[in-house]
């Protein structure tokens, strides 16, 4: 099974959309194997967005993602990275399809509700920024149980 990293941005928490967003992932068959609310540190933000260092949106992005609480999670399932990217929609909410998380709830490119890893390799790196392996829980869903 593939795992991917997702976090809900501060505006998602402020708009009380946590349950709505998480339920969309669960309805697609993804399993939450790690979940926590935290305030992202500047060090975590710099590691997460290091590929954008030097770009004009880098500092405002770091300021935004460290401005309030986030909900970080690891989701597991077949083709988890691809499934999550499909569910959340394009980065720009104006270009995201209706029915996607960003298409329905996103406001701007920065305040687009959710961050999700764009590849299995990035997912591994991003998970390590926010979670120790001891925080990842391996379990079976009822649907996975053998009777």
From Swiss-Prot:
The gene is ndk. The active site is at residue 115. It catalyses: a 2'-deoxyribonucleoside 5'-diphosphate + ATP = a 2'-deoxyribonucleoside 5'-triphosphate + ADP; a ribonucleoside 5'-diphosphate + ATP = a ribonucleoside 5'-triphosphate + ADP. GO terms for molecular function: ATP binding; metal ion binding; nucleoside diphosphate kinase activity. Major role in the synthesis of nucleoside triphosphates other than ATP. The ATP gamma phosphate is transferred to the NDP beta phosphate via a ping-pong mechanism, using a phosphorylated active-site intermediate. The keyword Acyltransferase does not apply. GO terms for cellular component: cytoplasm. Keywords: ATP-binding, Cytoplasm, Kinase, Magnesium, Metal-binding, Nucleotide metabolism, Nucleotide-binding, Phosphoprotein, Transferase. Homotetramer. Its EC number is 2.7.4.6. It comes from Kosmotoga olearia (strain ATCC BAA-1733 / DSM 21960 / TBF 19.5.1). One of its GO terms (biological process) is UTP biosynthetic process. It is found in: Cytoplasm. ATP binds at residues 9, 57, 85, 91, 102, 112. Its cofactor is Mg(2+). It is an enzyme of class 2 (transferase). The lineage of its organism: Bacteria, Thermotogati, Thermotogota, Thermotogae, Kosmotogales. This is Nucleoside diphosphate kinase. Belongs to the NDK family.
């Amino acid at each position: 099974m593939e795992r991917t990293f997702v976090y809900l941005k501060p505006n998602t928490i402020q708009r009380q959309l946590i349950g709505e967003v998480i339920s969309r992932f669960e309805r697609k068959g993804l399993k939450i194997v790690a979940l926590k609310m935290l305030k992202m540190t500047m060090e975590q933000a710099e590691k997460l967005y290091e590929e954008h260092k030097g770009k004009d949106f880098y500092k405002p992005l770091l300021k935004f993602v460290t401005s309030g609480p986030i909900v970080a999670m690891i989701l597991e399932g077949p083709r988890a990275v691809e499934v999550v990217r499909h569910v959340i929609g394009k980065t720009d909410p104006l270009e995201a399809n209706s029915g996607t998380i960003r298409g329905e709830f996103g406001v701007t490119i920065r305040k687009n509700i959710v961050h999700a890893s764009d590849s299995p390799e990035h997912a591994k790196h991003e998970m390590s920024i926010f979670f120790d392996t001891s925080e990842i829980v391996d379990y079976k869903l009822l649907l996975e149980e053998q009777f």
